Swiss-Prot record:
<protein>
    <recommendedName>
        <fullName>3-isopropylmalate/3-methylmalate dehydrogenase</fullName>
        <ecNumber>1.1.1.85</ecNumber>
        <ecNumber>1.1.1.n5</ecNumber>
        <ecNumber>1.1.1.83</ecNumber>
    </recommendedName>
</protein>
<feature type="binding site">
    <location>
        <position position="203"/>
    </location>
    <ligand>
        <name>Mg(2+)</name>
    </ligand>
</feature>
<feature type="binding site">
    <location>
        <begin position="260"/>
        <end position="272"/>
    </location>
    <ligand>
        <name>NAD(+)</name>
    </ligand>
</feature>
<dbReference type="Pfam" id="PF00180">
    <property type="entry name" value="Iso_dh"/>
</dbReference>
<feature type="binding site">
    <location>
        <position position="203"/>
    </location>
    <ligand>
        <name>substrate</name>
    </ligand>
</feature>
<keyword id="KW-0432">Leucine biosynthesis</keyword>
<feature type="binding site">
    <location>
        <position position="227"/>
    </location>
    <ligand>
        <name>Mg(2+)</name>
    </ligand>
</feature>
<dbReference type="GO" id="GO:0046553">
    <property type="term" value="F:D-malate dehydrogenase (decarboxylating) (NAD+) activity"/>
</dbReference>
<dbReference type="GO" id="GO:0000287">
    <property type="term" value="F:magnesium ion binding"/>
</dbReference>
<dbReference type="InterPro" id="IPR011828">
    <property type="entry name" value="LEU3_arc"/>
</dbReference>
<dbReference type="GO" id="GO:0003862">
    <property type="term" value="F:3-isopropylmalate dehydrogenase activity"/>
</dbReference>
<keyword id="KW-0963">Cytoplasm</keyword>
<feature type="binding site">
    <location>
        <position position="81"/>
    </location>
    <ligand>
        <name>substrate</name>
    </ligand>
</feature>
<keyword id="KW-0100">Branched-chain amino acid biosynthesis</keyword>
<feature type="binding site">
    <location>
        <position position="231"/>
    </location>
    <ligand>
        <name>Mg(2+)</name>
    </ligand>
</feature>
<dbReference type="InterPro" id="IPR024084">
    <property type="entry name" value="IsoPropMal-DH-like_dom"/>
</dbReference>
<comment type="similarity">
    <text>Belongs to the isocitrate and isopropylmalate dehydrogenases family.</text>
</comment>
C-alpha cells in the first residue's frame, strides 16, 4: 500500500490533481490517498497557508502529490520542500509526438539544487529604499546535488543516453559562491570517470537550450538559475502544461507540475493535466512501480499523438476527459 499525501492547492490544482488521481487509480495499484490543505484559500480561512496538520501528513506519507500554489507559494511549496529536505528538483525536458516543439529529439533533465542559493529566503531592508538578499552556497549541498546529478546520468546511460552532466553557473561574476559551485562540481566529477562533465555560464546555457538542446543529457545548476532555465526549457517542448517535476530527498519525495495556479482558467475544466500526470509518473518510479510508470507514460504518449488533448494543445477535450483517455489506455494494457 502506497500512502500518498494529496495537496490540490489553488486554482487549476483542484482540477489537474483529481484528473491525475483518475489515472493513478487506473493502474490498479494499492494507493491510500490522504488529502491535505495548503494555499491561498486555507490562508484566508485560518491565517496559515501551510497548516501543521498538512506538514504532519506530508512527513507521514510515502510521497506527496501537489497541484499548484497561488500567492502564498513561498509559504507553501518552497517551505514544504525545505521541511521535507527535498534537495534535488528534477525537471525533465522531453519532446512528445503530436505536440509542437523546437526539435523532436529533445530529451534531457534539469537538476536544480532546491535548498540554497537566493531562495534561502535571507532578505533584509538595511536602510530606507535599500534591500539585500543573501546567496548561500555550501560545499555539503553542492556535493549531494552533484552526486545526485551524476548518479542520474549513470542511470540514463544504462537506457542509452550519452552519460553526461553539464553544470550551469556564473562563476566569472559570482566568484565566491559560483566559484565554489564550479569547484565542487569538478571535484565530484572525479568520482565518476564513466560520465562526461562540462560547464557553461548560465547566460550562454540559456541560449544553448534553444540553439542546441539535443546535446544535453543532465544539466545541474543552482536554485534560482534552475527555476528560470527550466521554465524556458519547457517552452521548447510545448510549454508549462507539459512540464513535470520531482523534488527528491533522502527520505521524502514531493511531486508537482511546474506550472502555477492559473487563476484565469481555474474552474473552466480546460487546464492541461499532462504535467501533473507526468509528475505522477515520476512519483511511481520513485515508489519503485516502474512497470506502472511505463504504462502511464506510454498511454499519455498515445493520447498526445492522437491529439486527444485540452484546447491549449489544439484539442477539444476538457481536463477530465483527457485524463480519462489516458486512464482507459492504462486499464487496457
Amino acid at each position: 500500500m502506497h500512502k500518498i499525501c494529496v495537496i490540490e492547492g489553488d486554482g487549476i490544482g483542484k482540477e489537474v490533481v483529481p484528473a491525475t488521481i483518475q489515472v493513478l487509480e487506473a493502474t490498479g495499484l494499492p494507493f491510500e490517498f490522504v488529502y491535505a490543505e495548503a494555499g491561498d484559500e486555507v490562508y484566508k480561512r485560518t491565517g496559515k497557508a501551510l497548516p501543521e496538520e498538512t506538514i504532519e501528513t506530508a512527513l507521514d506519507c510515502d510521497a506527496v502529490l501537489f497541484g499548484a500554489a497561488g500567492e502564498t507559494a513561498a509559504d507553501v511549496i518552497v517551505k514544504l520542500r525545505h521541511i521535507l529536505d527535498t534537495y534535488a528538483n528534477i525537471r525533465p525536458v522531453k519532446a512528445y509526438k503530436g505536440v509542437k516543439c523546437l526539435r523532436p529529439d529533445i530529451d534531457y533533465v534539469i537538476v536544480r539544487e532546491n535548498t540554497e542559493g537566493l531562495y534561502k529566503g535571507i532578505e533584509a531592508e538595511i536602510d530606507e529604499g535599500i534591500t539585500i538578499a543573501t546567496r548561500v552556497i555550501t560545499e555539503k549541498a553542492c556535493e549531494r546535488i552533484f552526486r545526485f546529478a551524476f548518479n542520474l546520468a549513470r542511470e540514463r546511460k544504462k537506457m542509452g543516453k550519452e552519460g553526461k552532466v553539464t553544470c550551469a553557473h556564473k562563476a566569472n561574476v559570482l566568484k565566491l559562491t559560483d566559484g565554489l559551485f564550479k569547484k565542487i562540481f569538478y571535484k565530484v566529477a572525479e568520482e565518476y570517470d564513466d560520465i562526461k562533465a562540462e560547464d557553461y555560464y548560465i547566460d550562454a546555457m540559456n541560449m544553448y537550450i534553444i540553439t542546441k538542446p539535443q546535446v544535453f543529457d543532465v544539466v545541474v545548476t543552482s536554485n534560482l538559475f534552475g527555476d528560470i532555465l527550466s521554465d524556458g526549457a519547457a517552452g521548447t517542448v510545448g510549454g508549462l502544461g507539459l512540464a513535470p517535476s520531482a523534488n527528491i530527498g533522502d527520505e521524502h519525495g514531493l511531486f508537482e507540475p511546474v506550472h502555477g495556479s492559473a487563476p484565469d482558467i481555474a474552474g473552466k475544466k480546460i487546464a492541461n493535466p499532462t504535467a501533473t500526470i507526468l509528475s505522477a509518473v515520476l512519483m511511481l518510479r520513485y515508489l519503485g512501480e516502474y512497470e506502472a510508470a511505463d504504462k502511464v507514460e506510454k498511454a499519455l504518449e498515445e493520447v498526445l499523438a492522437l491529439g486527444l488533448t485540452t484546447p491549449d494543445l489544439g484539442g477539444n477535450l476538457n481536463t477530465f476527459e483527457m485524463a480519462e483517455e489516458v486512464a482507459k489506455r492504462v486499464r487496457e494494457e
